[in-house]
A protein has these predicted regions:
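Conserved PLP-enzyme active-site core in the AAT-like
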Residues: 2-28, 35, 45-51, 55-58, ...
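Generic structural marker for isolated residues within well-ordered, non-membrane alpha-helices
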Residues: 76
Length: 313
């Protein structure tokens, strides 16, 4: 079976194949840029693993309390090194991105505090976490208020509105990198960095948290490179490289991450407990592969979008 016959057996006609190849040829410059980002991110991950001397002993399974789990602890050091943060919490006990975000929010907001979302309304799954829709154990039920500043029509941050919205009760600023289910564009890391600098100039003490879901390794930098106090995401998405079967991460300042660890487990326990249950090989290998896997996904999305654009959509 030759190449054309192989595609034909999959239901791909010669006409469709030639059309796809022509689109791919036009996309070569765009793909080169995506591959350059992947190379930079791959070097970042390799450097983090070398710095923390990842070896076979870190793949050992643990059960029970998980005390002295060196594989788990070292994976967190790898994440902190790769994302240039003081600390990281990377656990299979974090079930999804929404769970990670809920931990980060509830750990760093106290009764009487305000959460201010400056990229518009967050994901639908956070509505009950915040209390926009009634739910037991929401931030609203615990006395945390919510404020929101929508993006401008062009998708940029509304800095005058952010300045007006900031007040003495504002403890945490929330930025959602991905467009989620909204028609707005995804926010670039450079734009997020500009927003972080603006907020920190007005309120150096405010905690800036970035929902980084779907954004890891898409660009050469992460929001943590521009001063985010926390970046939060899911291992089921980009950083798991398609291998992590479960898990989430929170990377940021030592103070913020410590509070998140106490919220995940219990005060006094923090990061000392949490067995890895034999998942370390998948979590290490997934993170190693993530830059390549993400670049492939981005190229696939760009290719399909270009195809449909040429077809008149």
């Amino acid at each position: 079976m030759n190449r054309d016959e192989m595609y034909l057996s999959l239901g791909v006609s010669d006409k469709v194949l030639q059309f796809g190849e022509a689109v791919l040829d036009e996309l070569k410059p765009r793909f080169a840029g995506i591959e350059e980002i992947a190379e930079l991110n791959q070097a970042k991950v390799i450097g983090a693993m070398q710095k923390n001397r990842v070896n076979a002993t870190h793949f050992a399974a643990s059960t029970g309390y998980g005390y002295d789990d060196e594989g788990r602890d070292n994976l967190e050091r790898v994440y902190a090194s790769a994302f240039h943060t003081e600390a990281a919490l990377v656990r299979p006990q974090i079930t999804c991105g929404t769970h990670a975000l809920a931990i980060a929010l509830s750990a760093n907001l106290l009764p009487g505090d305000e959460m201010l979302a400056i990229s518009g309304k967050p994901y639908d799954t956070l509505e009950e976490v915040i209390g926009l829709r009634e739910s037991p154990c929401s931030l609203k039920e615990y006395g945390v208020s919510y404020g929101q500043v929508d993006l401008r029509e062009d998708g940029s941050f509304d800095f005058p509105a952010i300045e007006r919205a900031l007040n003495d009760k504002t403890k945490l600023i929330h930025i959602q990198r991905s467009k989620g289910y909204c028609p707005r564009p995804t926010i670039s890391v450079d734009a997020i960095g500009e927003a972080i600098a603006f907020c920190k100039k007005l309120r150096p003490d405010v905690v800036v948290m970035v929902d980084n879901c779907y954004g890891e390794f898409v660009e050469a930098n992460e929001p943590s490179d521009f001063g985010a106090d926390m970046i939060v995401g899911s291992l089921i998405k980009n950083p798991g490289g398609g291998l992590a079967p479960i898990g989430g991460y929170i990377c940021g300042t030592q103070k913020c991450v410590d509070r998140c660890a106490y919220r995940l487990s219990a005060p006094g326990l923090g990061q000392e407990v949490g067995a890895n249950l034999g998942l370390m090989p998948a979590l290490y290998q997934g993170f190693f592969l993530a830059p390549s896997v993400v670049s492939g996904a981005v190229k696939g999305a760009v290719f399909v979008a270009a195809c449909y654009e040429k077809l008149g959509f």
